[in-house]
Amino acid sequence: MNNDAISTTVTSIRNANTKRKAMTRIPVTKMTRGIVQILLEEGFLKSVTEHTEGGKIFMDVKLRYFGKEKKPYVATIRYISKPGLRIYCDHIRIPKILGGMGIAILSTSYGLITDREARRRKTGGEILCHIW
């Protein structure tokens, strides 16, 4: 497993979507729990269940697809702020993803929130990832 929990989460979801898997397993941290919760609230995921296996907590994330071709709701998920290069912005410079069709997840003093919520609260933070 990678030492960076955010990249592990983003990569697991991206790989599962590419292979049209129904579910993926992600190790639980406060950060991964927050990211998955936002994706669930925004409708990109179907459901999430937590379970313990060998003393470690994991989340089983059920991915959401539509149509007969099983097209994923998460077309693209991109990791932005990396451990070697952190990306911060204030509320004025928060990017609109696909003109508001996608979301950006930010780590702020309010916790993990979407770009819309950050603009509404007029707060900036670290841009973790873009999803559309």
Curated annotation (Swiss-Prot):
- Please indicate if the UniProt record lists Plastid as a keyword: yes
Gene of this entry = rps8
Q: Which InterPro entries match?
A: Ribosomal_uS8, Ribosomal_uS8_CS, Ribosomal_uS8_sf
Q: Sorted alphabetically, which keywords does the UniProt record give?
A: Chloroplast, Plastid, Ribonucleoprotein, Ribosomal protein, RNA-binding, rRNA-binding
Localization per Swiss-Prot or TrEMBL: Plastid, Chloroplast
SUPFAM superfamilies found in the cross-reference section: Ribosomal protein S8 (SSF56047)
The keyword Ribosomal protein is assigned to this record: yes
Tell me the Gene Ontology biological-process terms attached to this UniProt entry.
Answer: translation
Q: What does this protein's UniProt record list under function?
A: One of the primary rRNA binding proteins, it binds directly to 16S rRNA central domain where it helps coordinate assembly of the platform of the 30S subunit.
* Pfam families referenced in this protein's UniProt entry, alphabetically: Ribosomal_S8 (PF00410)
**Taxonomic classification, please?**
Eukaryota, Viridiplantae, Streptophyta, Embryophyta, Tracheophyta
Q: What is this protein called?
A: Small ribosomal subunit protein uS8c
Gene Ontology cellular component? Answer: chloroplast; ribonucleoprotein complex; ribosome
Q: Which GO terms describe its molecular function?
A: rRNA binding; structural constituent of ribosome
Q: Which family is this sequence assigned to?
A: Belongs to the universal ribosomal protein uS8 family.
* Quaternary assembly: Part of the 30S ribosomal subunit.
Q: Which residues form the signal peptide?
A: none
